[in-house]
């Protein structure tokens, strides 16, 4: 019997830099769903990839001294490495620089133009370069980009526009008649009330202000913008062809069963993408799910805040499956989730090392100790066994129900409910006492069998979320019974075989103090490495500058000032000022907040990680409503350019300058 196809897609990652753990959450979430669908017997195709065109990339490549293609090759490679590190089972990793994709995008653009859905005009408004988006004055927030909060510029350019307005009513009708199309419900309401019902404006779909994009083949002054380029990857990745010569993959898997994207870009994927598909006379994805954000503490991750956490660092500290568990377990269905170092350590020690790891280790060790590792089931049952079996048999239906609604965290909780019940069963049956009674050996074997079978069933279900750990547990039990669809049966663990002689420690406990010392040491080492790798400026003999001398002071006056080395661990722009930055500066074992008028010369991102010279005994002052507890020293040239004064050699934060 042929398997039913299931196509799941994610947003494609923008190749502007290395993805943090918040970006990584989406691919792990999609992977858990794809793995689960395979376990249910579906023929799954899972696609992800990278979005590689745009002005931001053109600028970053120029700053790096490489071509845009060289730049995206490097970043796309980094992204793919992290996706692979996280053990994601994608079937297709598409790049928007792929030749087939680029050719099909040109054909899609031309088709839409030829049928009158794309027309040429002029776009004028407030433009945000990082977001590559135009905004009207009313859309700005405090005069800045409503999406990223950065400064915007006035811009006008010739552009092609896509007639969103032509299809608005049709899309509204579709959403109303397909209640599962946009999920969760809150995202659907947001799209309807904030965008569709007030009326859609036509969409700018080309650019002339940069060249790094797919050329419009009939007007090469223009490049195709992201709304046509990136959004079409979900069909071009299947071999869709505008001329009707689509690959069998497209015919088999389209429309997508699940399109998984972040809540911040849901407008593009529930309005722009569906209308493009309607204009191409193609079916829409069956469901678009806008997942919430994974935060660090109470806020989004940002380099300027110094709170960015990368997946590969977490893997180094905890291991792949532990990181998968953190991000999947801590994400609610429709609200933002949050991780902290303290929470990750708690989950590691309580859930993974104790509830799961210790249970597996104890059970296998007892079977080795009491029965030489041989698995047997004499069937000497008692009433206490019934509840364990009931919890085990109920698990798969509960997991199915949660996964059907994409409540992945809740599904994992159902598996851990069984693991907790197994731990309780040990306390109830006390195998170590049974072992001392020669007349209770068959009962002891039955108890251990029930435990191992409960563990086996939990491990089979965990394969979608912790694939390596699942396989290790099943291997240690020596079982080939790994079929999720058979979890409605208790007692499939084969008898007569043997468990592993020395069970592996699945998850080692972590000491929070030792971990944070390692994290801080790694941060310092990375900052030092980046500083050492920075290209040195060629030494030049320059003409000196003269300044107006100030009144002389005594040595005693000078000695009143205290200078120390400080390390900037976080930095952000002061909202009420265009000149000020607010830095969190580590000095010794304390952190001070210092406001500096250097915003025109350094971005917040550039400041983080720098060692600077600080006057530390100035009386605190308030600048633009923000308290400042010191002064960061800079030098100023004749043109007013500022440069931070930094130690020539590596010095610890807090070192006295004398």
Question: Where do the PLM segments sit?
Answer:
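Intrinsic disorder at enzyme termini
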Residues: 473-557
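Phosphate-backbone binding interfaces of nucleic-acid-interacting proteins
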Residues: 533-658
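N-terminal catalytic cores of NTP/NDP-binding nucleotidyl/phosphoryl-transfer enzymes
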Residues: 2-75, 94-110, 114, 131, ...
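Secondary-structure transition/capping motifs at alpha-helix termini
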Residues: 1-2, 36-43, 64-68, 85, ...
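A glycine-rich helix N-cap at a beta->alpha junction
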Residues: 76-91
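Cys/His-rich short segments
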Residues: 115-168, 172
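Structured secondary-structure scaffolds
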Residues: 2-48, 100-104, 148, 154-369, ...
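Helix-rich, typically C-terminal accessory recognition domains appended to large enzymatic cores
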Residues: 120, 343-380, 391-499, 615
């Amino acid at each position: 019997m042929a398997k039913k196809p299931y196509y799941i897609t994610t947003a494609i990652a923008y190749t502007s830099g290395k993805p943090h753990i918040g970006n990584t959450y989406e691919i792990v979430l999609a992977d858990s769903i794809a793995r689960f669908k395979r376990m249910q017997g579906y023929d799954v195709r899972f696609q992800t990839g990278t979005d590689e065109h745009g002005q931001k990339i053109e600028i970053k490549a120029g700053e790096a001294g490489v071509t845009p293609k060289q730049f995206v090759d490097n970043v796309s490679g980094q992204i793919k490495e992290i996706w692979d590190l996280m053990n994601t089972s994608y079937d297709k990793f598409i790049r928007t620089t792929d030749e087939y994709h680029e050719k099909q995008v040109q054909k899609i653009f031309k088709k839409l133009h030829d049928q009158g859905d794309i027309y040429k005009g002029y776009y004028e408004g407030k433009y945000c370069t990082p977001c590559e988006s135009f905004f009207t004055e009313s859309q700005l927030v405090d005069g800045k980009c409503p999406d990223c909060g950065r400064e915007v510029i006035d811009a006008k350019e010739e552009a092609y526009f896509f007639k969103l307005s032509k299809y608005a009513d049709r899309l509204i009708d579709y959403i109303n008649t397909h209640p599962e199309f946009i999920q969760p419900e809150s995202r659907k309401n947001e799209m309807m009330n904030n965008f569709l019902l007030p009326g859609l404006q036509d969409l700018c779909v080309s650019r002339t202000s940069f060249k790094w994009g797919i050329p419009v083949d009939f007007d090469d002054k223009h490049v195709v913008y992201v709304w046509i380029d990136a959004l079409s990857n979900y069909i071009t990745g299947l071999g869709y062809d505008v001329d009707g010569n689509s690959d069998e993959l497209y015919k088999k898997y389209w429309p997508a069963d699940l399109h998984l994207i972040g809540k911040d870009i849901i407008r593009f994927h529930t309005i722009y993408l569906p209308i493009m598909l309607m204009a191409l006379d193609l079916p829409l994805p069956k469901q678009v799910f806008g997942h919430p954000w994974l935060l660090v503490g109470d806020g989004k991750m940002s380099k300027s805040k110094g709170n960015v956490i990368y997946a590969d660092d977490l893997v180094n500290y905890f291991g792949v499956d532990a990181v998968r568990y953190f991000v999947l377990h801590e994400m609610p269905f429709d609200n933002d989730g949050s991780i902290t170092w303290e929470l990750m350590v708690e989950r590691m020690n309580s859930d993974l090392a104790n509830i799961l790891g210790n249970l597996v280790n104890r059970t296998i060790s007892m079977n080795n100790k009491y029965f030489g590792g041989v698995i047997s089931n004499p069937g000497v049952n008692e009433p206490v066994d019934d509840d364990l079996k009931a919890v085990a048999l109920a698990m798969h239906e509960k997991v199915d129900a949660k996964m059907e609604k994409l409540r992945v965290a809740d599904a994992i909780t159902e598996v851990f409910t069984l693991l907790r019940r197994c731990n309780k069963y040990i306390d109830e049956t006390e195998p170590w006492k049974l072992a001392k009674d020669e007349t209770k050996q068959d009962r002891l074997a039955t108890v251990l069998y029930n435990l191992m079978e409960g563990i086996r069933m939990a491990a089979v279900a965990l394969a979608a979320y912790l694939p390596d750990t699942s396989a290790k547990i099943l291997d240690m039990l020596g079982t080939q019974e790994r079929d999720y669809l058979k979890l409605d049966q208790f007692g499939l663990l084969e008898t007569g075989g043997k468990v592993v002689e020395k069970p592996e420690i699945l998850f080692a406990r972590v000491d929070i103090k030792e971990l944070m010392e390692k994290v801080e040491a790694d941060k310092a080492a990375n900052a030092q490495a980046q500083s050492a790798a920075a290209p040195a400026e060629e030494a030049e003999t320059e003409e000196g500058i003269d300044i107006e001398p100030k009144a002389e002071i005594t040595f005693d006056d000078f000695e009143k000032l205290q200078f120390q080395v400080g390390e900037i661990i976080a930095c952000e722009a002061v909202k009420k000022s265009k000149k000020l930055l607010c830095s969190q500066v580590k000095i010794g074992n304390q952190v001070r907040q210092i406001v500096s008028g250097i915003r025109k010369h350094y971005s917040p991102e550039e400041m983080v990680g720098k060692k600077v010279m600080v006057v530390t005994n100035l009386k605190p002052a308030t600048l633009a409503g923000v308290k400042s507890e010191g002064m960061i020293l800079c030098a100023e040239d004749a043109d007013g350019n500022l440069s931070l004064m930094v130690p020539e050699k590596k010095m610890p934060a807090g070192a006295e300058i004398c």
